[in-house]
Amino acid sequence: FKAQNMALNAAVTVDGSEIGHAQWVQALAAGVEPEAAMNPVLLKPTSDRASQVVVLGRPSGVLSAAEYHQAKRSLWPVVLDALAGLRDRFDVVLCEGAGSPAEINLLDGDLVNLPLARAAGLPALVVGDIDRGGVFASLYGTVALLPDDLRATVRGFVINRLRGDPALLGDACADLERRCGVPTLGVLPHLGVVDIDNEDSLALDRPPA
């Protein structure tokens, strides 16, 4: 589930609904049929400052960024109803955020990250990419920037894309928990080349499988 995605590369479900290609791939990986509720709001950019807004798989108009910022408050019921329906029908629903959960200039009206976790009563994990460098500063800074009500939704960190021996992290994860009160629940290895389309982009230079 991803409440809102921005991508030109939509996929079409069996009933003709458009959802983000990434959510379509994720559904197939989970062994379930992709459906509109898995990506209730899809933004398909038409220019640098405007997007076609697709709601529950159907186009609903083209809005500028400023117009969408105002309009998206009305999409909360759509998002929450879609998520509730999935939770009723599936044992586990994994919700993906977008970008950073601590973009403090965007928290007002954010319907895809921790405000969604708060509204739906979801425990949240913050995933940091150690391959990019600065993962501990990034995780600590994320929690430090969050208001108290959103910080309370964060139950743990996951460190992703580690190259080499996890023992090289030493006591850093424990130190991070002492500093901010959030445990590191897992460290995932770098898998090298993975033949899956990048999020929000379709590999157009690759022949179809």
Predicted segments with their positions:
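Flexible phosphate-sensing "switch/lid" loops adjacent to ATP/NTP-binding sites
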Residues: 1-209
